[in-house]
Amino acid sequence: MTRIRRGYIARRRRTKTRFFASSWRGARGNLTRAIIQQRIRAWFSSHRDRTRQKRDFRRLWITRINAAIRENGRSSIYSKLIHNLYKRQLFLNRKMLAQLAILNRNCLYMISNQILKEVDWQESATILEI
């Protein structure tokens, strides 16, 4: 069987994959078959880690908010803060609250103290009505 020389389309496809893998070390950056396998692995990892990154950032924000709230001194924890925020219909997401905890902690304290005052006032009002 005679050898068929491939045209420019196959060469263009291979050079495109080589540009994708130009920074990889060893055979993974030089050999076409190894590049293709490693590219599939890289796409899989990037897809998996995009969802993992969302999860990790959410955990980080929750940890920062909880640490800042516990420093406040009043008996408040993260879950109660979020519950009371939703009860008051203050829809501040966790990313915004974490930024407040880092950059402007006094503002976060004011928000949490105001919410706690309102909750205490309403609970005492319901006790008096009964």
Curated annotation (Swiss-Prot):
- For this entry, list what GO says about its biological process: ribosomal large subunit assembly; translation
| InterPro entries hit by this protein | Ribosomal_bL20, RIBOSOMAL_L20_CS, Ribosomal_protein_bL20_C
Q: Which residues form a coiled coil?
A: none
Pfam families associated with the record: Ribosomal_L20
- The primary site where this protein sits is plastid
Where, per UniProt, does this protein localize?
A: Plastid, Chloroplast
Task: Say yes or no: keyword Ribonucleoprotein present.
Answer: yes
Key word Ribonucleoprotein present: yes
Q: Name one GO cellular component term.
A: ribonucleoprotein complex
Please provide, alphabetically and separated by semicolons, the GO molecular function terms listed in this UniProt record.
rRNA binding; structural constituent of ribosome
Per the entry, what this protein does is: Binds directly to 23S ribosomal RNA and is necessary for the in vitro assembly process of the 50S ribosomal subunit. It is not involved in the protein synthesizing functions of that subunit.
The record's PANTHER family line, in alphabetical order, gives:
39S RIBOSOMAL PROTEIN L20
- Family under the similarity heading: Belongs to the bacterial ribosomal protein bL20 family.
Instruction: Provide the protein name.
Output: Large ribosomal subunit protein bL20c
Q: Which gene encodes it?
A: rpl20
